[in-house]
Amino acid sequence: MEQTYQYAWIIPFLPLPVPMLIGLGLLLFPTATKSLRRMWAFQSVLLLSIVMIFSMNLSIQQINSSSVYQYVWSWIINNDFSLEFGYLIDPLTSIMSILITTVGIMVLIYSDNYMSHDHGYLRFFAYMSFFSTSMLGLVTSSNLIQIYIFWELVGMCSYLLIGFWFTRPVAAKACQKAFVTNRVGDFGLLLGILGFYWITGSFEFRDLFQILNNLISNNEVNFVFVTLCAILLFAGAIAKSAQFPLHVWLPDAMEGPTPISALIHAATMVAAGIFPVARLMPLFIVIPHIMNFISLIGIITVFFGATLALAQKDIKRGLAYSTMSQLGYMMLALGMGSYRSALFHLITHAYSKALLFLGSGSVIHSMETLVGYCPKKSQNMVLMGGLTKHVPITKNSFLLGTLSLCGIPPLACFWSKDEILNDSWLYSPIFAIIAWSTAGLTAFYMCRIYLLTFEGHLNVHFQNYSGKRTTPLYSISLWGKEGSKISNKNFRLVTLLKMKKNGRPSFFSNKVYKMDENVINLIQPFLSIPNFGNTKTYLYPYESDNTMLFPILILILFTLFVGFLGIPFNQDVDILSKWLTPSINLLHQNSNNSIDWYEFCKDAVFSVSIAFFGIFIAFFLYKPVYSSFQNLDLINSFVKMGPKRIFSDKIKNAIYDWSYNRGYVDAFYGTFLTAGVRKLAEFTHFFDRRIIDGIPNGVGFLSFFVAEVIKSVGGGRISSYLFFYFSYVSIFLLIYYFLNL
């Protein structure tokens, strides 16, 4: 056991050789390195698998045992200041290490096929391996300085991966936005770290908690300053976990490849956002106001993220806002002091969300054969629908992930979310009402995403790519508040082009196909991808390859069974409680971590009823019951029937506007913050050029002018000098005379 802990420092550095060797290989032997590129994927998976096995071994040893701090080396700046580096192995570290490695392995295996066509394949795996190193280093850190170092490396890797396709202007802007927004939180984190070092004189967690507790209990510290430093520390977590109001980078981050979206939402945002708050819980608990502030930010984010997800057209952005809301639940639980519930939901949500993102990637991958390699088309749920027959494995896996996130038993998120919802009643009835209402919204928007993606008919054959509706019937999620336009009954279907290798588009003749006893006239969507030698033609999407389906199937198992780790029927079965011993729980301080069947069933029936209500509303609005009507037009909502529908239309349009405009937060920042900073910069530039530079420039110009005048006067004649001399004397005498009158 001691030997295992002795070598635990190697955990973050095991994946590091891959990016280093890829970089050296591309620099010294580029052709050979590129030709053996699949080998690097295998090495990435192998090294991360070793880390996973090592982490699991540590986790087993951590059950009912104390945490281990190991000093490695120190960097001595001077006699009074030195930085110590080591690692901390405790239940929190074990949980995060297993989560990062398991999700990371699934994403790497998935990416091997998903990114196989991409010229940046090697670069992607180099970034991913370095990303894993950064996250593992973050969760094993023993002090605030190490956390900050690896925190910045996580931010750098996020920047590189979000902007992976940097030749696309949208992706380049997205990674810049993510970088700048996170810099706000990072600056707050740095100030908070320096503030607590000034108070306690230590960066080490164990010393920091003990010293601060003694200072506060003896009333030897400025409480306002301590609270300010704690808020600054929390600001870093707000930015990294996309909590309100520093969440604006999250939807734009979907411009990166789908596998990295899965890793960011399942592992990174909890490793770099929720983890620091959980790690610093002993510090925050002695500052009651900061706990209230954490729970307030959490409940705002819970509701805000759910409302923004209600009418998204992009499948990945809908899931992104879902992550924002679910991380809000975790932050709410931490703010309430329900440490176990927060970490339980962290685990269950991670695997469910990874399953959903990899499932969405499979859908996007299959849609690209029809609409081309353009995210605005392949990720647009307007063009999806009817995929059940074409991608059945992806459909079933996505359905399981959806039901898990909705809170349907016995799937993973049901067990963890229920604990948070029940604890919220003990903390604040107002917060509880918001949290329970948002649970219904979660079921609604997740079921909506599923229905628009997999049910009905494939809409790419019936809608143009601009998303304009072709009938006077509409849905708030698809067509928004656009005015009704009566379309021509003999409308022409979307024209699909084939891009030849010479880049010239060519039209293909119409052919008649039979779908569900309805004869429709389609243009066969032959597609060939330039430079990849693809000669296959596709009329419908097809299921992904086994390399992509294998991680999805493994994540299905996690989604089905990981929730049983924390079922609190009795203390012997509750593995999670044993794992987290000792655990912080301010709401159940005298609890023995077990509940009776009656209490559990009563709470479960209520939460499941709310989830089913949200699912029912989604089916009522988005189930395409009219899809067999003329032209197989997709109708997801009600038929307009005159003035009675005006009020409901306004509500739908308001919801759509709120979601489409991202809650107007981006517009607010653009109007007041960005525009204000630009005006301040313009004023500063004017003041600097005209005032600061103007004064010395003016003095110089005046001196030059006076010198030129004097120069022109001096002609070398004594009579001229005498004339000017007596003239000036006379002027001064007159001035003196008038002043003494």
UniProtKB/Swiss-Prot annotation:
Task: Name the chemical reaction catalysed here.
Answer: a plastoquinone + NADH + (n+1) H(+)(in) = a plastoquinol + NAD(+) + n H(+)(out); a plastoquinone + NADPH + (n+1) H(+)(in) = a plastoquinol + NADP(+) + n H(+)(out)
Q: What class of enzyme is it?
A: translocase
**Gene Ontology terms for molecular function:** NADH dehydrogenase (ubiquinone) activity; quinone binding
- Protein's membrane topology: Multi-pass membrane protein
Which chain regions cross the lipid bilayer?
Answer: 9-29, 40-60, 89-109, 125-145, 147-167, 185-205, 219-239, 258-278, 284-304, 327-347, 354-374, 396-416, 425-445, 549-569, 605-625, 721-741
Q: According to the UniProt entry, what is the EC number of this protein?
A: 7.1.1.-
**Single biological process term from Gene Ontology:** electron transport coupled proton transport
Function summary: NDH shuttles electrons from NAD(P)H:plastoquinone, via FMN and iron-sulfur (Fe-S) centers, to quinones in the photosynthetic chain and possibly in a chloroplast respiratory chain. The immediate electron acceptor for the enzyme in this species is believed to be plastoquinone. Couples the redox reaction to proton translocation, and thus conserves the redox energy in a proton gradient.
Q: Which NCBIfam families match?
A: NDH_I_L (TIGR01974), PRK06590.1 (NF005141)
Family listed = Belongs to the complex I subunit 5 family.
Its protein name is NAD(P)H-quinone oxidoreductase subunit 5, chloroplastic
Which source organism does the UniProt entry give? Guizotia abyssinica
Q: What lineage does UniProt assign to this protein's organism? A: Eukaryota, Viridiplantae, Streptophyta, Embryophyta, Tracheophyta
Quick one: which gene encodes this? ndhF
